[in-house]
Amino acid sequence: MMTMNRVSRRLLLALVLASPVPVVLANGVPVPKAIDGQGYRLVKDWDFGKNIRDEAALRREFHTRYIYENGKLDRLKDEWQRYRDNENHVFDDGGLSLVARVTGGLKPGGIESGMLRSRWTGQYGYFEARVKVPAGRGLWPAFWLNPEDQVWPPEIDIMEIVDNGRDTTRNSFHYVHGHGPKKTRNMESKLDKSGSYRPGVDYADGFHTFAVEWTEDRVRHFVDDVMVVDRAYVWQHNDGRDAGPAHVLMNLAVGGGWPGAPSAATAFPARLQVDYIRVWQK
């Protein structure tokens, strides 16, 4: 019996050592399976349930407007919301919520919402966020990368989810890797590598992780640790120049041409719940 116990323990130990176990850093952050063993290190850990828990900490790490117009731009194109700081970044037990609120009527300019633009910038790496998106027609949560030099394009949309009742719903996410020819007339013609992924689940039902591995010549998208996109891609401006470092953005837009107008059934306040945003680099 004693011999059998030793054999059993040795066999169990061998099985454990042979099993794929995620590496956990000293701060308790697991290395994502997609990049485990590839030499990545954690460079930013914006954990809204642990190390960023109030407005002061948030402001040290993030701006709350776009970089354009001297850092004061509060919307893009025909979006209805205006990004503000009036109860639009709300901390609770689970993390941070970017909150869209109707403050002046359900119309363009009548909605305030929240956004984050990182003060940190970097080029290449593995960018991951764990979020729960809101349900409702006309809502447009997004997690993306944009150059710090204020020249657009390119951009990398890690996740965009809309429910416009037509081509894209909450059980898909849209991705964009943008750069293209000169003298184009609109945004869509410049975004030369885009598409959607539909796993058959409603992202508004719970938290999900969205990530991109961005290298000098490729982008790989991951949803809940599953790779869904793998494409050749070069980060450059329309004139062929390298676009340099990017900042990280997370925002909850409302309305506009793609998501359409909110419907009477769209519930406000609407919340994009953010557990964490992390960046890994080599």
Show where each model-derived region lies.
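Extracytoplasmic entry segments of secretory-pathway proteins
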Residues: 7, 24-26
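N-terminal secretory signal peptides that target proteins for export/translocation
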Residues: 1-6
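N-terminal signal peptide c-region/cleavage motif recognized by signal peptidases
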Residues: 20-21
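N-terminal export leaders
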Residues: 9-13
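GH16 jelly-roll
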Residues: 27-282
